[in-house]
Regions:
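Ligand-binding pockets and gating/stacking loops
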Residues: 1-492
Length: 492
């Protein structure tokens, strides 16, 4: 093939022959790799066909409070009683033996472990925060806490899937996919759903956490790397000019569209048409959106980009979480609908899974997130973006009140844990719900995580009962078949 003349005899063979030939020289976008990775050569989900342009903006069901959402996911399960859920009774009874009911766990009795952190009330609202997060403590009046969440799984993999997709098994669309499906994207030149991972490793269950499940692949998350070039394979192959590549993609999409007209239920192909067009646009838009050199030195300092406390030895660049928070702000500023940042990777001490010692775990991870999150909230506010951006913080579950092992470790606990929300439509300076006096189990105003999902959808302008996708003979919903309750106490 003569790459200098891409229009010569482009349609001489069959469509499949054309795609196969182009796979060898489709520039850095790697057509064949994209087709294979996205399952083009495999089976196609038997789902309803999406709209002709899957990511076109859609009208919300409700008066929308927030236009975008940034989900800060603390992988491993942060310890609520060492960060936000102050439990003086637990501290008083430190070292005493207690029998605490557990489901599907071997340990139900042991010694209570009080927190070594110092708690203080902050802001006009008097919200409790420990000394592990001194910068974030200054933002307490922006946060709405739900301290009585509970979930169904003690295992990281299934708990993460449930927090992301509402189910403890793979194959279901993630919340970002539901938002993309329900609202579309405000910027057709950037992904509507972006995921940024910790350079220490991706979370357990991997891409299933940001999968579109049985929905078209157009709604799945696009992963940005933590360091170096965030999106691989965007640079054109040497000798291929922008007009040549534009002609090439137009021809591919024309052939795909003709094929789609004959096979209207082929949702994977429809997603690929949109993906190739987006990939071409990303070659121009992504470098600008991700260029932190355009930010002022004061902004970089605010996010901790030059602060060694926000760094860690396995990073691919300085202050990865601070960089990701700043990139998240730049993305929502440009109309990206949903950005999810995972903090914590690998195993145990590389994430929030504090089996071997909660104090050491907090000393590692809290400085990495404290300054960047406080900066993100303050930056969104000073730019007038906080009212239209929903920020969500939390993990897949919390930690137990009992000590694990011979030190100061804590085991998993889905029976009672804390999340906080800030921004669009949220009543800042609020603490809703309570765990028991030991922080072990949700006790007052208990809410299953399906209620959190319904609340997030509501804040984004979507009615959980109307946001449905027909699959398997049913109108499927993020919140499942059990009717959820919107957590009204968090709403402004």
């Amino acid at each position: 093939m003569n790459t200098g003349r891409p229009n010569q005899n482009l349609c001489a063979g069959t469509r499949r022959e054309f795609l196969w030939q182009m796979g060898a020289g489709f520039t850095g976008l790697a057509l064949t790799a994209l087709l294979d990775q996205d399952g083009f050569f495999g089976s196609v989900a038997n789902a309803a066909a999406p709209a002709s342009t899957p990511m076109s903006p859609r009208i919300a069901h409700l008066p929308r409070h927030a236009k975008s959402c940034i989900f800060l996911f603390m992988y491993g399960g942060p310890s609520q009683m060492d960060l936000f859920d102050y439990k003086p009774e637990l501290n008083k009874r430190h070292g005493q033996t207690a029998n605490l009911e557990q489901r599907r766990r071997a340990v139900s009795a042991g010694k209570l472990l009080g927190s070594k952190r110092t708690f203080q009330q902050y802001g006009r609202s008097g919200q409790w925060c420990s000394d592990a997060l001194p910068r974030l403590a200054t933002q307490m009046d922006k946060l709405a806490f739900i301290k009585s969440l509970y979930a169904d799984s003690f295992a990281h993999g299934s708990a993460m899937l449930q927090m992301n997709s509402g189910r403890i098994i793979q194959g279901w669309p993630s919340m970002g996919s539901w938002l993309s499906y329900g609202l579309g994207s405000m910027n057709q030149n950037l992904p509507g759903y972006v995921v940024m991972l910790d350079p220490r490793g991706g979370p357990i269950s991997g891409a299933a956490n940001w999968s579109s499940g049985f929905m078209p692949a157009a709604y799945q998350g696009t992963v940005f790397r933590a360091g170096g070039q965030p999106i691989l394979n965007l640079d054109p192959t040497s000798g291929i000019t922008a007009p040549m590549q534009r002609d090439l993609i137009t021809t591919v999409n024309t052939l795909n569209t003709e094929h789609l007209a004959k096979h209207p239920g082929y949702s994977e192909l429809q997603a690929r048409i949109a993906s190739y067009e987006l990939a071409f646009q990303l070659q121009t838009t992504a470098p600008e959106a991700l260029d932190l050199a355009k930010e002022s030195d004061a902004t970089k300092e605010m996010y901790g980009l030059n602060d060694p406390k926000t760094d860690h030895p396995l990073a691919l660049g300085p202050a990865p979480f601070g960089r990701q928070c700043l990139i998240a702000r730049r993305l929502v500023e440009r109309g990206v609908r949903f950005v999810q940042i995972y903090h914590g990777g690998g195993h145990q001490q590389q994430n929030w899974d504090a089996h071997n010692g909660v104090e050491e775990n907090l000393k590692i991870h809290c400085p990495e997130i404290d300054k960047p999150i406080a900066a993100l909230l303050a930056d969104l506010e000073q730019r007038g973006m906080l009212d239209e951006t929903l920020v969500v913080w939390g993990g897949e579950f919390g930690r137990q009140a009992l000590v694990q092992g011979g030190g100061d470790g804590r085991d998993h606990n889905p029976k009672g844990f804390t999340y906080w929300l800030a921004g669009g439509g949220v009543k800042g300076g609020t603490s809703y719900g309570e765990t028991d006096e030991l922080g072990h189990e949700a006790a007052l105003d208990k809410h299953h995580i399906r209620d959190l999902h319904a609340t997030i959808l509501h804040l984004m302008g979507l009615d959980h009962s109307k946001l449905t996708y027909f699959y398997g003979g049913l109108n499927q919903k993020l919140t499942g078949v059990i009717e959820p309750e919107i957590i009204r106490g968090l709403l402004a």
